Amino acid sequence: HQITYLEGYLWDAPLAQESMVKAASLAKASNRQVALTLSDSFCVERHRESFKDLIGDYVDLLFSNEDEILSLCQQDETESALQIVRSFCDIVVVTRGAKGSLIATGTETLKIDAVPVNDVIDTTGAGDLFAAGFLFGFTHGYDINESGKIGSTMAAEVISHVGARP
């Protein structure tokens, strides 16, 4: 798999939106998959409809935490939000901290356990490292379940110390 990864934080600036749409369009024209991380529930609130358009038109893999996906879908329950997003996105990954993550594909939802951490020091970068681990596994031929476990392992490592670098 070749994947173009888009960062939701960049969506606030109109020029960045234009650039991200162009990158996604070029990726699709080159038979690449497109991944998007929503990054921030407040950004999702500001740009809900345009995010939905971007996801529906281009995104194959969506990464979010619970707050972000609930905001995107204007739902109160994660499962109901997953049902909505899975109708227009192939793979939806929702990180849930100590509760692990959910990965929705088509009609299946996988639950990935969080890797236990003795002392959580700093959660900065946990979602980013989860996405990096998942994408590493996915692009190296691992199935979605194993890719989720790699993501969980990466997230556990980064929260065990100060700072976002492993």
Name the predicted role of every residue range:
Residues Q2-I3, A131:
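Short SAM/SAH-binding signature in class I
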